[in-house]
Amino acid sequence: MAFLDNPLIILAHIRQSHVTSDDTGMCEMVLIDHDVDLEKLYQSSVSGENSTQMQSNGGETQGYVYSQSVDITSSWDFGIRRRSNTAQKLERLRKERQNQIKCKNVQWKDRNTSHSAEELSSLFERKNFKERALNQGKQSILSVRLEQCPLQLNNPFNEYSKFDGKGHVGTTATKKIDVYLSMQTSQDKLLPMTVVTIANAKVHDLIGLICWQYTTEGREPKLNDNVDAFCLHIAEDDGEVDTDFPPLDSNEPIHKFGFSTLALVEKYSSPGLAAKQSLFVRINAAHGFSLIQVDSTNVTMRDILEKALKRRKGSQRNSGPQYRLEKQSQPNVPVDLDSTLENQNSLEFCLVRENSSRGEEPPEEETQIDIATVQDMLSSHQYKSFKVSMIHRLRFTTDVQLGISGEKVEIDPVTNQKTSTKFWIKQKPISIDSDVLCACDLAEEKSPSHAMFKVTYLSNHDYKHLYFESDAATVNEIVLKVNYILESRASTARADYFAQKQRKLTRRTSFSFQKEKKPG
């Protein structure tokens, strides 16, 4: 331990001890006041003493003189490094270069040709700024809207304007949909109308909003005032209406459907749907009748005859007995097979075997069908879905949605099924084309609340069976609808199935007959 009584030495020692550890320089700031006072004190004392005393005290003052380091400056701007001259010069050159970019140099050239005074005056024409034309400002959007206000007051669909989502973008959930309008002309039909609706609106509300926007924009032709006369169909990106699917349910919310392109179609006068409607020709035979589906009246009678022969258990025209067609109203008068259906002026014909007349054939009971049955036959090709239960092995059932149309039968599993997850049964979607559909039969009917039916179809040269169950009314409706579709189509798979079934029945009958004959 050392005892020091010289303040200069103590200050120098503290400053040198903390100079390497204190980066902030606060050690110098704390002692700077005392340092200044001592400096003033020693300056006054040095001026009053002689030189001998200064030499004697030289050893003591030497510590104060060299107490301050050369690299340390006791000032308020400590720690700030001054910029070098080179950096300042480069900054100045950079600013000058930026200023030169903003300036444009134009080279002056003396004109070689002399221009007249008129030409010079036309180059720099004098304008009179005192006379200014009255500035007629552009009409504002508000003024245009106010002028169109009487038209909007007469809009019969004003009650659906509250579902317009153009003013709610960013605040409320909205949905943007491109709508094709089938009632417009061919040119305007190609361009969709963009509609923005709120997400919680129903399909019925969206139809009303489309009609409101259609009327507000002044489109032609004018729409029917009844919103129920229209429906929304799924549409392709080019505007083609997909009539294979039914229209959207008007009571469902629009956010349930993920389609961004729809088509507004009139329910009872849809050109897209009318083009797909088919005609049915009735062919009377010796043991019943059949309905032949044709696309148009331009089909030849030869094609109708071939379809009718295929319907008779797959028989062909060039094999077996030969047949001809006659009008039901004109017996024994063959129909020209090269003519079209349009030239016959009839949709009911009779299938007669060659070299025989209609009177020589076995008497046939007149089959009477009422109008309701004919309507059921014609409407059987329209799509309709049923909710039934599909029966698996070990009698496990799965709830599915059975969709039936004239082209195919679709089986889609219903989501969130507790039974399927419990027994590890995961039903996959199945699509059966009508050409490979063979039969639909009622399996059993125990009570009005429970019945079973079987669907048979051809898959990889093998006949497969699917069993379903539901209430008796639904099952009977499904079986009748599928059989109407099968009767109106010429399916080779169905004909082969019945032929194979007939052969098995014949073989079984002959075997039982031989078994009964042996004891005798």
Curated annotation (Swiss-Prot):
The keyword Mitochondrion applies. Pfam families: CRIM, RBD_SIN1, SIN1, SIN1_PH. Residues 139-267 form the CRIM domain. Gene3D superfamilies: Pleckstrin-homology domain (PH domain)/Phosphotyrosine-binding domain (PTB). InterPro entries: CRIM_dom, PH-like_dom_sf, Sin1/Avo1, Sin1_N, Sin1_PH_dom. Residues 382-487 form the SIN1-type PH domain. Its main location: membrane. A 1,2-diacyl-sn-glycero-3-phospho-(1D-myo-inositol-3,4,5-trisphosphate) binds at residues 393, 428, 464. The keyword Nucleotide-binding does not apply. It is a peripheral membrane protein. One of its GO terms (molecular function) is enzyme-substrate adaptor activity. Residues 279-353 are annotated as: SIN1-type RBD. Residues 310-333 are annotated as: Disordered. It is found in: Cell membrane; Endoplasmic reticulum membrane; Early endosome membrane; Late endosome membrane. Phosphatidylinositol 3,4,5-trisphosphate (PI(3,4,5)P3) promotes MTOR activation by relieving MAPKAP1/SIN1-mediated inhibition of MTOR that takes place in absence of PI(3,4,5)P3. GO terms for biological process: TORC2 signaling. GO terms for cellular component: early endosome; early endosome membrane; endoplasmic reticulum; endoplasmic reticulum membrane; Golgi membrane; late endosome; late endosome membrane; lysosomal membrane. Component of the mechanistic target of rapamycin complex 2 (mTORC2), consisting in two heterotretramers composed of MTOR, MLST8, RICTOR and MAPKAP1/SIN1. Contrary to mTORC1, mTORC2 does not bind to and is not sensitive to FKBP12-rapamycin. Component of the mechanistic target of rapamycin complex 2 (mTORC2), which transduces signals from growth factors to pathways involved in proliferation, cytoskeletal organization, lipogenesis and anabolic output. In response to growth factors, mTORC2 phosphorylates and activates AGC protein kinase family members, including AKT (AKT1, AKT2 and AKT3), PKC (PRKCA, PRKCB and PRKCE) and SGK1. In contrast to mTORC1, mTORC2 is nutrient-insensitive. PANTHER family: TARGET OF RAPAMYCIN COMPLEX 2 SUBUNIT MAPKAP1. Belongs to the SIN1 family. This is Target of rapamycin complex 2 subunit MAPKAP1. It comes from Xenopus tropicalis. The gene is mapkap1.
